[in-house]
C-alpha cells in the first residue's frame, strides 16, 4: 500500500499542523567543494575557501524558527568533484562516524560530476545507518546572483531534520533520490540527477510528497563504519568494433574486479571466441566481473539472449539494475570486507542497502 506524506506551501509553518512541532535538530554540513562553493577566476570557476560559510549567514531562511541548527565543517583544500578519490570518500565517512552521536543528520556539499559515486560509496560504507545523510550541490555557484544553490541548501537541511529518512540520499532540484540509485543526467539543466530504475523518495513543490513506503528501514544493528581500501578494479564500456587487445591489456593487469558495461539486457558479442575466452580466463583467476547494462532503464537478464548467455557461461555475474556507479563502489566495498571471491560474488547480487531489485 502506497503511503505518501504531504506537506503544503510554506512548509516549515504548516508542518506543525500536519505532524506536530518537530524538535530542533542539529545538522552537520560537510563542505567538500564543487560548483556550489565556487567563484569566478581567470581559470574558470574554482572552489573558494571560506566563501560558503560566509554566504550562508546571509540566507534568511536558514534562521527560520522551524529550520534545524547547523554547523559547517569546510574541507581544506576544497575540491572540484572531478578530483575525488577513495581517500576523500574515507574522509567523509570517517567524519560522519566521528560526529555520529553529536548530530541528528548530515548534509554534504559536493560537486555534481562524481556525486553519484560518493553517494553510492557512502551508502555501503555507513553500515546500519539510522540517520539521514544528504548530498547536494548546484549547477550554478552560490556566488552568482541567479543560482540553484539556495533552494538545494534550504531543502536539504529541512529534509535532513525529517525523522523517517535514514539513508544516504541526493537532493537536487526538487527531488530526493536514493544515493546509490542516482546518476547525473545533465551537465546543463538544473534537473541534473535522476534515479532511472527507482522512484523518487520525495518530490518537492508547493506540496512536499515524501514516499515513506520507499524509504529504507533501519536494521536495528549498531552503526558501523567500513572504510574502503583501494583495489585494482576497472569499468570497461563496450562499443561496436572495440579492439579485443584493449580488453586483453586491461585483464593482464592484477585486477580484482571489472564492471563490464554491456548492451541492452546484458549482451555482448558472442562471435569472437577470443573475447569470451579472455573473460572466462579472468573469472577462473578470481577476477570478479560484473555484467552491468549501459541502459539507464532496465535490468541485466543474461538468459534472455544468446549474446548474454555467453557471458554467463564465461563466469560473469549479473549487476541486475544497479547503476555503473553503484556497481563500482559496491565491488570496492565488498573486496575490502572479504577476500573470498565466492563471497563477493554472492553479495554483489544481493541488495545490501536498496541498490538493486531482482
Q: Predicted regions span which residues?
A:
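ATP/NTP phosphate-donor binding region
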Residues: 23-98
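Short, acidic/small-residue loops that bind anionic groups at enzyme active sites
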Residues: 119-150, 157-163, 282-293
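Short Gly/Thr/Asp-enriched flexible loops that form oxyanion-binding sites at enzyme active sites
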Residues: 108-131, 270-278, 307
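Internal gly/pro-rich beta-alpha loop/helix module
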Residues: 135-205
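C-terminal non-catalytic interaction/assembly regions of soluble proteins
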Residues: 265-358
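Short acidic, glycine/serine/threonine-rich loops at helix termini
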Residues: 40-43, 119-120, 145-148, 178-184, ...
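Accessory alpha-helical/coil subdomains and C-terminal extensions
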Residues: 24, 30-34, 40, 52-64, ...
